[in-house]
Regions:
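Alpha-helix capping and helix-loop boundary segments enriched in small/acidic/polar residues
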Residues: 141-149, 179-184, 195-206, 225, ...
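Residue-level marker for beta-strand->alpha-helix junctions and adjacent short loops that shape enzyme
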Residues: 168-169, 254, 296-297, 543-544, ...
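Loop/turn elements at helix/coil->beta-strand transitions in domains of secreted/extracellular proteins
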Residues: 130-131, 157-160, 220-221, 242-246, ...
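Primarily recognizes the serine-hydrolase "nucleophile elbow" in alpha/beta-hydrolase
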Residues: 210-283, 576-650
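Cap/lid segment of the alpha/beta-hydrolase catalytic domain
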Residues: 129-216, 252-265, 490-580, 625-630
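Generic beta-strand/beta-sheet core signal
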Residues: 123, 136-137, 164, 225-235, ...
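Alpha/beta-hydrolase-fold serine-hydrolase catalytic core, especially in secreted/extracellular enzymes
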Residues: 1-118, 128, 194-200, 213, ...
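N-terminal cap/leader regions of alpha/beta-hydrolase-fold enzymes
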Residues: 199, 238, 302-304, 310-311, ...
Length: 729
């Protein structure tokens, strides 16, 4: 191996791409356990008193709110009783329960955020209320079903009860431009909201807290009780708002380290880095927390509907009572000598009599446990639950669309501290943005501390160049791998520029760098560049294996990481290795990628400044619209690529802002008119911001866009000229 001095022989056999994905899987499983044990580094608890403890955990509570997307100021709740055709709420008897009934039932609506309301049922005790409670069923339960169960029991016990509608797991309305998917409604909203720094969980927490805002006027004790998805909402609402003196969490609490296997609408950026259920419970203390362990909602996956697809896998299973008890004891242990008011109850179903006895005890007898769980018949004329759910779904979708439209202006404010007076000031003042992009959006892993241990082998040779497979260690179980093409005409002592040529989704290095494979959308571009005299390296990126790699993203996100958390150090290691080769010019190393490789072209060079330029092919876009639009048929809201969504990206970095981090280095877009990843108008709109930035810095010649009559493919005309100009010119 004359072109690989000092490189050991590569002896690995089999599918190296599958080996890479499997190794990252092992790494992330270890990291999940390790980081759970390291959470205390984020906590500065003072357990000398409850007052000091409350003050010491305030930053943690704020960070939890950020993780959950609870970041917007609410509007006044303005509770409204909904009037329906043919029924007057002022008329007694015929349309309302009898005077002997322990409570009355009203359909209500209240305001939450601009453009977002809540709808549900208000259960008003006949006697003066002794407490106010928000009761939340599972996502697939209607408020009427909750009123017929523990919600009604709470009202019969003397509580004023508000029961919000939650977005369910059906897929009836999940689609874009008439193209329907089998995504649960919760997933459909999650996708758009997540991209914009919000969450379906956070929106429903806000609905609960808006109810609490309304309850404030009554000056009564307040609590929250929920089952299943409602238990999740209740638990986190109580952790965030100290006005809630009691939380009953049923069918939810337990160890959270397998969050990646739960439905994707529970995926929460960086949650497990700082919070398990025990840590969240510690935010509820010293207030009362009752964990009612009963069978969780049975969810084996997304709806199975003929002709529909695109949903992410994910299931809900019931943990053992021992696992739940262990997590609750861990919560108690976090509080030192402070005595928490936590209780664990085993039950067959949510809202057991034993739970109500516990509520009676902790309320000092104000809330009386019933001998049985009485209910009141629903009055006639209540709004249609399905129509109400549709209104709430449509409204929440439109809420995400309003956020999407506003995002551009939020980003402008976010970027206000970048000084574009001249190139030097631009480079200086964008360093902080690069750091934030890497650490807060991509998720930064520590720099590798193990040697690269390069291994290689020759895999083919042509008249113009020789091809080698190269493997480099990055982290335990994580390696970089790709194909190096070395032209034959390099003179002794000569140093050539390098082009790193990146494949797309489900691709391999061979797709771009092996002349023996069949023609494809890459058109042998690494080989053609090698024929032009460039050294090329074609890495294997880990977006291969369908759900196997997408599960990596699921495991990574709760740790504040992503696929690109691995891809960035892989590429840095590759460039460091290339610099050691005697025929490589380490100052002239460029990037050129198609599709997911184009996605890489705006993210990796934005962080890895050893790349001297970047060419993005078949991916440049108004990326936030692409991910969040509920109108455009090319939106990722309707596809099976559920790993695409990056938390809060929309409010910080669109593709133009990513190119700001590449600037002043040269940057180019290659765009086929027929490429279905976007429309020319979107691409041009976003690129105009890039060109504007380069032009105003006086370096407009460093950025270009080429349109060509073609589909999703490497064109290799203008881009090749761009490489020649900036690497050799």
């Amino acid at each position: 191996m004359e072109h690989l001095p000092g490189v050991k022989p590569l002896t690995w056999k089999g599918d190296l791409a599958a080996r890479m994905v499997a190794g990252m899987d092992r790494y992330l499983r270890r990291a999940t356990a390790e980081r759970a044990a390291q959470r205390e580094r984020y906590w500065k608890r003072d357990t000398t008193s409850w007052e000091r403890h409350e003050k010491s955990i305030a930053p943690n509570r704020k960070r939890l709110a950020k993780c959950l997307g609870v970041v917007d100021d609410r509007v006044p709740a303005d509770m409204q009783v909904v009037a329906w055709a043919g029924t007057s709420l002022d008329r007694p008897s015929a349309e309302r329960p009898s005077e002997a009934a322990p409570y009355t039932i009203h359909a209500v609506r209240w305001h939450v955020l601009p453009g977002l309301t809540a709808e549900g049922l208000l259960l008003e005790p006949t006697a003066p209320a002794v407490a106010n409670v928000v009761a939340l069923g599972d996502a697939d339960q209607t408020p009427e079903q909750v009123a017929d169960g523990f919600g009604g029991a709470l009202a019969a016990s003397g509580c004023r009860v508000l029961i919000p509608t939650l977005i369910n797991r059906d897929c009836e309305w999940s689609g874009v431009a008439g193209i329907l998917t089998n995504q649960p409604h919760r997933e459909f909203i999650y996708r758009a909201a997540y991209e914009l720094g919000r969450h379906v969980i956070g929106a429903e927490i806000q609905k609960v807290l808006a109810a609490v805002d309304w309850f404030d006027q009554f000056r009564l004790p307040m609590g929250v009780m929920g089952y299943g998805e409602g238990g999740l909402i209740a638990f986190n609402a109580a952790a965030l708002d100290t006005r809630l003196g009691l939380a009953v969490v049923s069918g939810y609490f337990g160890p959270r380290e397998k969050l990646f296997a739960e439905p994707i609408y529970r995926n929460t950026w960086r949650l497990l880095e700082e919070f398990g259920d025990a840590e969240i419970a510690s935010l509820v203390a010293p207030r009362f927390l009752i964990v009612e362990h009963c069978p969780f909602p049975a969810v084996s996956g997304p709806p199975q509907v003929e002709g529909r697809s695109g949903a992410a896998p994910g299931a809900i299973t019931t943990p053992s009572v021992a696992a739940v008890e262990k997590e609750l004891k861990r919560a108690m242990g976090l509080l030192g000598d402070l005595p928490p008011s936590f209780g664990l109850i085993e039950a067959d179903a949510p809202g057991s009599l034993l739970t109500f006895e516990f509520i009676q005890e902790v309320s000092g007898g104000a809330v009386c446990a019933p001998d049985e769980l009485p209910t009141v018949p629903l009055p006639p004329g209540l709004p249609d639950p399905q129509a109400r759910l549709k209104r709430q779904f449509d409204e929440m979708v439109e809420w995400t669309q309003a956020l999407m439209r506003e995002a551009e202006y939020v980003r402008r404010d976010y970027w206000a501290k970048a000084d574009a007076t001249d190139v030097k000031l631009w480079e200086k003042t964008t360093k902080a943005y690069r750091k934030r992009f890497h650490e807060e959006v991509i998720g930064a892993l520590p720099a590798p501390d193990m040697p690269p241990n390069p291994r290689g082998r020759q895999v083919f040779a042509t008249e113009a160049y020789t091809g080698y497979e190269v493997v480099l260690d990055v982290y335990p179980d994580v390696f970089a791998y790709g194909i190096l093409l070395v032209p034959h005409d390099i003179a002794p002592g000569e140093r050539r520029p390098v082009v790193v040529c990146q494949h797309g989704l489900e691709g391999r290095p061979q797709d771009v760098a092996d002349p023996r494979i069949e023609e494809n959308c890459y058109h042998y571009f690494a080989c053609r560049l090698a024929q032009r005299g460039f050294v090329t390296f074609s890495p294997q990126n880990p977006y291969i294996g369908m759900d196997k790699f997408r599960v990596l993203q699921r495991m990574a996100n709760p740790l504040g990481l992503s696929l690109f958390s691995f891809i960035i150090p892989q590429h840095q290691r590759i460039l460091d290795f290339l610099k050691t080769l005697p025929y490589v010019d380490g100052k002239r190393m460029a990037f050129y990628g198609l599709s997911y490789g184009g996605k890489t072209a705006v993210r990796v060079p934005a962080v890895v400044t050893d790349y001297c330029l970047s060419v993005c092919s078949g991916d440049f876009n108004e990326w936030i619209w692409k991910n969040a639009s509920a109108r455009a048929p090319l939106s990722y809201l309707r596809t099976g690529e559920y790993e695409m969504f990056e938390f809060d990206l929309g409010m910080t970095f669109n593709y133009a802002e990513m190119t700001y981090l590449i600037c002043p280095r040269p940057f180019m877009v290659e765009r086929g008119h027929w490429d279905g990843v976007s429309w020319d108008e979107w691409v041009s709109y976003e690129f105009a911001k890039t060109r504007y930035r380069y032009d105003l810095l006086g370096i407009g010649e460093r950025t270009e866009i080429e349109y060509f009559n073609g589909p999703h493919e490497i064109n290799g005309v203008g881009a090749f000229a761009f490489l020649e100009k900036h690497l050799r010119g």
